[in-house]
Design a protein with these regions (language model features):
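A positional/architectural concept
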Residues: 53-92, 96-97, 101-107
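Eukaryotic intrinsically disordered, low-complexity regions enriched in proline/serine/threonine/glycine
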Residues: 146, 253-254
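Extended, small-residue-rich solenoid/repeat segments and analogous flexible loops
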Residues: 1-73, 245-248, 252
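Short proline/glycine- and basic residue-enriched helix-capping loop/turn segments at helix->loop/beta transitions
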Residues: 124
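Glycine-rich hexapeptide-repeat left-handed beta-helix
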Residues: 20, 24-47, 85, 93, ...
Length: 254
């Protein structure tokens, strides 16, 4: 039944698009063609639909597709693509997938082994990273622009440096920093680097909640914010202080 309704919906949407094209052709040079973005932040495929957290942040420009499961307080940032079409993607709690990261899976590869991508809890995946059919365990850190390939395992608390290439089947042990292309052992992680893996996850969980709230605001709430900012610019802070009004408590009727 669901497939039937989906098919009917597709027909109706395509009919509307066809009518719009006919109307534009009749208007000739006076027609205005508005390009509507077909981007879908959440998209099911092969009868698989992403499972999203109740508390977390999925950026509106991200793409979460297919068999993807994301844990509580995790965040997927702007421009990131999680494509669980030919296999599954599993992401734990309080993990952050930063801007423009690509996460994919494998149905087939050189080893002939189908492989999902599994990411644990409190993992940081830096901007522009690529994770393909690999495993990244709890509290690991993947630097910006790094690539982790099929069958590779980044153990708990390990760190992959920015721009590194972790080749297929490689294991990055706990407490080690790997860098280079191909990635190799550089040294043991410092106490500061180990602390960073924890604070990064906590910070992104907090910031993600702020972004989620801002992106969920209604038109009326946005207009209220604009009016409040305008009043704050126009009214002297000393005036408010004499009235005993704190700026954060100023109420503006829109």
């Amino acid at each position: 039944m669901s497939r039937f309704m989906f098919s009917i919906g597709t027909v109706l949407r395509e009919t509307g698009q066809a009518l719009d094209r006919i109307g534009c052709s009749m208007q000739g040079s006076n027609a205005f063609r508005e390009a509507i973005s077909k981007h879908r932040t959440i998209m099911g495929i092969y009868e698989k639909t992403p499972a999203l957290p109740r508390a977390g942040f999925i950026a509106p420009s991200a793409s979460v597709i297919g068999d993807v499961s994301i844990g509580e307080k995790s965040s997927v940032w702007y421009g990131a693509v999680l494509r669980g079409d030919v296999n599954s993607i599993r992401i734990g709690a309080q993990t952050n997938i930063q801007d423009n990261t690509v996460i994919h899976v494998a149905k087939t590869n050189v080893g002939g082994v189908a492989a999902p991508t599994i990411i644990g809890d409190r993992v940081t995946v830096g901007h522009n990273a690529i994770l393909h059919a690999c495993t990244v365990k709890d509290d690991a850190f993947i630097g910006m622009g790094a690539t982790v390939m099929d069958g590779a395992v980044v153990e708990s608390g390990a760190m992959v440096a920015a721009g590194a290439l972790v080749t297929p089947g490689t294991v990055v042990p706990t407490g080690q920093l790997w860098a280079g292309a191909p990635a190799k052992f550089m040294r043991e992680m410092t106490a500061e680097e180990k602390a960073l893996t924890v604070t990064s996850a906590e910070t992104y969980a907090e910031v993600g909640a702020v972004h989620a709230a801002e992106n969920d605001k209604s038109f009326e709430e946005l207009e209220y914010d604009k009016a409040a900012r305008r009043m704050a610019r126009e009214r002297d802070p000393d005036y408010d202080s004499h009235l005993g009004i704190e700026r954060s408590q100023v109420k503006v009727q829109v």
